[in-house]
Amino acid sequence: MCGIVGYVGRDLALPIVLGALERLEYRGYDSAGVALIEDGKLIVEKKKGKIRELVKALWGKDYKAKTGIGHTRWATHGKPTDENAHPHTDEKGEFAVVHNGIIENYLELKEELKKEGVKFRSETDTEVIAHLIAKNYRGDLLEAVLKTVKKLKGAFAFAVITVHEPNRLIGVKQGSPLIVGLGEGENFLASDIPAILPYTKKIIVLDDGEIADLTPDTVNIYNFEGEPVSKEVMITPWDLVSAEKGGFKHFMLKEIYEQPKAINDTLKGFLSTEDAIPFKLKDFRRVLIIACGTSYHAGFVGKYWIERFAGVPTEVIYASEFRYADVPVSDKDIVIGISQSGETADTKFALQSAKEKGAFTVGLVNVVGSAIDRESDFSLHTHAGPEIGVAATKTFTAQLTALYALSVRESEERENLIRLLEKVPSLVEQTLNTAEEVEKVAEKYMKKKNMLYLGRYLNYPIALEGALKLKEISYIHAEGYPAGEMKHGPIALIDENMPVVVIAPKDRVYEKILSNVEEVLARKGRVISVGFKGDETLKSKSESVMEIPKAEEPITPFLTVIPLQLFAYFIASKLGLDVDQPRNLAKTVTVE
C-alpha cells in the first residue's frame, strides 16, 4: 500500500503535494518524499517514517515550485530507509520518479544499466525507471517515457518530472491505480480520489496501458504506442465528507470520537521532536498568543498553563484585534499563532506584523506546509489528521495537548506533568462513554432559545468554547462568561427559562462556583452541570448533570469540553440541522 500524487499548475506545489499525501495516509506507508522543480533544479526530499519527518526536513525552505510529485512508500524492494524512499532520480538529478507496484524484470534492467556505467544509489526497482527515462530522453519527455515503458514488465504506476520541461507532468498506469484530476490552470495525478478532492471533482480514471501527459492547461492521454486516447471525464459523486466519514452519521461526531487518538498522536509528535525546539519560553519577557475562534479558546487555556508551569506572563489576543491595536511588541516577546488550517488570514497577518516588530514567531497548526507553517520562525504541529467538520473538535483538544506539553517543558515537575497528560486519552474515552446520558440532556433543552455557560479559571475558556459550539451548529444563542462576573451583568438574564451550563470539576475554584450555582438557583435558573462522577453535592443542586471522570486539576479542560461538544452536536442533530456545514461558516477563513 502506497500513494502517488503529482501537481502542475499555478500555485505552490509543495503544500498541495504534502496535503495530498496526508489524505493518502490511510493507504499505509513507511516513508515519504517529494520532488520539486525549483529554478531549473530538481529538489528532492525524502524521509523514513511519517510525513511529519518529511516536513521537519523541509522546515524553513520556502520553495516557489509550481510542479511537484510526492509519494508515500510501503517497502517492497529494499528496506524502509531514507535512500530507498521515493522519489528516485537519475545520476545527474534531472529526472524524478515516484512509483507504485513492482517492476518484475528490474534486476535484468539494472544489470544492463550497470554495464553501461550507471551507478545506483538505492535497493529499489523504481530507480531503474529514472535511469531508463534519462537514457531515452532526446528532448521530449513523452517519447522517453514511451520508450521506457516498452522495457518494463510487471504491474505498476509511476509519475515523472524533469528539469528540462518544468511545466510538464507525466503519469503511467499499468496494473496499479492512477487518476487524473482536472483543474483550472492546474492538473493533478493521484493514486486515489480523496487526495485531490479539495481541488477538483473532475476525474479521468486511467486504464492499463495508458499515459497521461499534463501541463497546467492541457491534458492528453495516450496508449503505450503513443496514440491519442479519448477519455471520459467523470464528475465524482464523492466529497471529502462522504469519502472519509467512516460510518458515522456526521463528520463532527466521528471527529469527537477521534479525540483520544488526536491527543495521543499530538503528544507523541511533540515528544519525538521536542529536542528540535530552538527556544525556551523563559528566555522571553512575555508570551503573546494570537488566534481566532476555537483556536483562541485553546490559547486561553494555554495562557493559564504557561503562567503556572513556565512562569512567563502571557496574553491572549484575538488576531483580528491584534493587527489594528497598538500592542507593544519587541524581540523580547515570543508570539504564538494558533490556526488549525495554517491559513487563517487574520492570524497569518498578525504573525507577520509581530515578526516585523522583531518578535520570535511560532505557528501551531494542523496543516503542514500551510502559510503560517512556512512563514513562522518555528512551527509546532498538531497531529489530529484532517478535520472536515466546520465546528472544530479534535483539533481543539490537539491544540490543548501541544500547548500543555510546551508549557510544562521547562518545569521542574515536567515528568509528572507529562504523565498526567499521558492519562488524558483514556480519560477522554471514559467521558465519551457517557454520550447516551448527554444525548438525553440535549433532548431536554433542544428547544431553548438562549443558554448561559459559566466557568472559572482553566474552565472559563471551556465555557466560551461550549457556548461557541452550541451557537455554531444549533443556531441557539449562547454566551460564555466567567462565573465570578455573573453578578456584573448576566445575572439579569437568569430566570426559569434560562438554562445555565456550569462547569464545576473539583478544583481550586470549586467552592466558589458552587456559590455561583446557588445564585442561579435563587433566581429560578435551570442548572446543567458538568462535574466529576459521584459528586453528589453538585448533583443535588443541578436539574441535569453531565459527568466526567475524576482527574487532576491541570487536565480537566480536556474532559469538561467533551460533554459540551456532544451536547451541541446532539441538539443540532435532533433539530435536523447541517451539523458539518453550518450556515455562513467556513472551515478555513482566508479573508479578513
From Swiss-Prot:
<dbReference type="InterPro" id="IPR005855">
    <property type="entry name" value="GFAT"/>
</dbReference>
<comment type="function">
    <text>Catalyzes the first step in hexosamine metabolism, converting fructose-6P into glucosamine-6P using glutamine as a nitrogen source.</text>
</comment>
<dbReference type="Pfam" id="PF13522">
    <property type="entry name" value="GATase_6"/>
</dbReference>
<feature type="domain" description="SIS 2">
    <location>
        <begin position="441"/>
        <end position="582"/>
    </location>
</feature>
<feature type="active site" description="Nucleophile; for GATase activity">
    <location>
        <position position="2"/>
    </location>
</feature>
<keyword id="KW-0315">Glutamine amidotransferase</keyword>
<dbReference type="Pfam" id="PF01380">
    <property type="entry name" value="SIS"/>
</dbReference>
<feature type="domain" description="Glutamine amidotransferase type-2">
    <location>
        <begin position="2"/>
        <end position="217"/>
    </location>
</feature>
<dbReference type="GO" id="GO:0006002">
    <property type="term" value="P:fructose 6-phosphate metabolic process"/>
</dbReference>
<dbReference type="InterPro" id="IPR047084">
    <property type="entry name" value="GFAT_N"/>
</dbReference>
<keyword id="KW-0677">Repeat</keyword>
<comment type="subunit">
    <text>Homodimer.</text>
</comment>
<feature type="active site" description="For Fru-6P isomerization activity">
    <location>
        <position position="587"/>
    </location>
</feature>
<keyword id="KW-0963">Cytoplasm</keyword>
<feature type="domain" description="SIS 1">
    <location>
        <begin position="277"/>
        <end position="416"/>
    </location>
</feature>
<dbReference type="InterPro" id="IPR035466">
    <property type="entry name" value="GlmS/AgaS_SIS"/>
</dbReference>
<keyword id="KW-0032">Aminotransferase</keyword>
<dbReference type="InterPro" id="IPR029055">
    <property type="entry name" value="Ntn_hydrolases_N"/>
</dbReference>
<dbReference type="GO" id="GO:0004360">
    <property type="term" value="F:glutamine-fructose-6-phosphate transaminase (isomerizing) activity"/>
</dbReference>
<dbReference type="GO" id="GO:0006487">
    <property type="term" value="P:protein N-linked glycosylation"/>
</dbReference>
<dbReference type="GO" id="GO:0097367">
    <property type="term" value="F:carbohydrate derivative binding"/>
</dbReference>
<dbReference type="GO" id="GO:0006047">
    <property type="term" value="P:UDP-N-acetylglucosamine metabolic process"/>
</dbReference>
<dbReference type="GO" id="GO:0005975">
    <property type="term" value="P:carbohydrate metabolic process"/>
</dbReference>
<keyword id="KW-0808">Transferase</keyword>
<protein>
    <recommendedName>
        <fullName>Glutamine--fructose-6-phosphate aminotransferase [isomerizing]</fullName>
        <ecNumber>2.6.1.16</ecNumber>
    </recommendedName>
</protein>
<dbReference type="InterPro" id="IPR035490">
    <property type="entry name" value="GlmS/FrlB_SIS"/>
</dbReference>
<dbReference type="InterPro" id="IPR046348">
    <property type="entry name" value="SIS_dom_sf"/>
</dbReference>
<dbReference type="InterPro" id="IPR017932">
    <property type="entry name" value="GATase_2_dom"/>
</dbReference>
<dbReference type="InterPro" id="IPR001347">
    <property type="entry name" value="SIS_dom"/>
</dbReference>
<dbReference type="GO" id="GO:0005829">
    <property type="term" value="C:cytosol"/>
</dbReference>
